[in-house]
Amino acid sequence: MFEPIELTSDAVIRVVGIGGGGGNAVEHMVRECIEGVDFFAVNTDAQALRKTEVSQTVQIGSSITKGLGAGANPEVGKNSAEEDKDALRIILDGADMVFIASGMGGGTGTGAAPVIAEIAKDLGILTVAVVTKPFNFEGKKRLIFAEQGIDELSKHVDSLIIIPNDKLLKVLGKGISLLDAFSAANDVLKNAVQGIAELITRPGLINVDFADVKTVMSEMGYAMMGSGISKGDNRAEESSEIAISSPLLEDIDLSGARGVLVNITAGFDLRLDEFEAVGNKVRSFSSDNATVVIGTSLDPSMNDELRVTVVATGIGMDKRPDIKLVTNSTSNKNIMDRFGYRYSDKENTMSKNNNEFSKIKNKTKEDLQSDYLEIPAFLRNQAD
């Protein structure tokens, strides 16, 4: 009989949101209260850092931008990160795995993300980036900046996930609110981090440790991450289908994946046939030569729900693949059902001249909602 395995030590997982878009994504995760992960926000914009819910922040390029944004100039973002490499190295050092979140096409995220990724790789850290591409209406120049930034970032990360903002309109429909649309994109990062963190930090019937995760994700290039949750008699099949649909991710063909990591999260009622159903779904799209790792995480709070998180890596190593999406009528509903916000009070800040995290003024839930719903600033932050 299988017994839950108690882990003696946990891998150190950190998430770094860079610029306005990356900061928004990490704030979304903070509200979701994901355990076993440290969160950091990095920005040239001092005002944005003062307003963020993220508990640990690093201001970069203060002598270059004077505390303002990068002005949609990636070179300014790059130089700002180069100026404060020591402060960035401090927040990365000691981590086993780092997720980098950024909106590409603006200044801070586009320019600083590759620098931060390079620091992480030099420290021997497993580095995964999840980035957004700008809307077409934002202009050709911003899209070119985004492509250049993604190309540079890909040189310094183990795995790279790309979320095109234009898919928000195509997948979620024109009637979706702006707040919910960007929340859907933020959910991609949240589910990826949560799924991997739970594999490593939660006891399970089938144990997966950090070495397994590193095998699947190290030096793999383009990747896909998806998560689905369902309940009822067919919950295993349905959640697996939703997970591999990933409608908000860059168009990908999963059949060439070189590595597949799967986390099944459920209560103590998880059945053997459900485990088999998820495994069959994974085998249906992965190649015979792929390294497949499947683990379970036990969470009594799931009740009769079952969640499947899939990480497929090494996709299109020679060229970017053509579209091959699995459609599912319930996937949009599940994305929307996962929305929800919780607010934290604790806030700290760290700058080049102050490596100790100092407390700053607490904000109320109403203040945070007002900041987040201020549309012009929100659009500016998402792009920068």
UniProtKB/Swiss-Prot annotation:
CDD domains registered for this protein in UniProt: FtsZ_type1
Any single GO CC term annotated in Swiss-Prot or TrEMBL for this entry: cell division site
InterPro entries per record: Cell_div_FtsZ (IPR000158), Cell_div_FtsZ_CS (IPR020805), FtsZ/CetZ (IPR045061), FtsZ_C (IPR024757), Tub_FtsZ_C (IPR008280), Tubulin/FtsZ-like_C (IPR037103), Tubulin/FtsZ_2-layer-sand-dom (IPR018316), Tubulin/FtsZ_GTPase_sf (IPR036525)
Keywords tagged on the record: Cell cycle, Cell division, Cytoplasm, GTP-binding, Nucleotide-binding, Septation
PROSITE patterns per UniProt: FTSZ_1 (PS01134), FTSZ_2 (PS01135)
Subcellular location: Cytoplasm
Residues given in the record as GTP binding sites: 20-24, 107-109, 138, 142, 186
Source taxon at top rank: Bacteria
GO molecular function: GTP binding; GTPase activity
SUPFAM superfamilies linked to this entry: Tubulin C-terminal domain-like, Tubulin nucleotide-binding domain-like
Gene3D superfamilies associated with the record: Tubulin/FtsZ, C-terminal domain (3.30.1330.20), Tubulin/FtsZ, GTPase domain (3.40.50.1440)
A biological process from GO: division septum assembly
Main location: cytoplasm
Pfam families hit by this protein: FtsZ_C, Tubulin
Function description: Essential cell division protein that forms a contractile ring structure (Z ring) at the future cell division site. The regulation of the ring assembly controls the timing and the location of cell division. One of the functions of the FtsZ ring is to recruit other cell division proteins to the septum to produce a new cell wall between the dividing cells. Binds GTP and shows GTPase activity.
Assembly and oligomerization: Homodimer. Polymerizes to form a dynamic ring structure in a strictly GTP-dependent manner. Interacts directly with several other division proteins.
The family this protein is said to belong to: Belongs to the FtsZ family.
Name the record gives this protein: Cell division protein FtsZ
Native source species: Wigglesworthia glossinidia brevipalpis
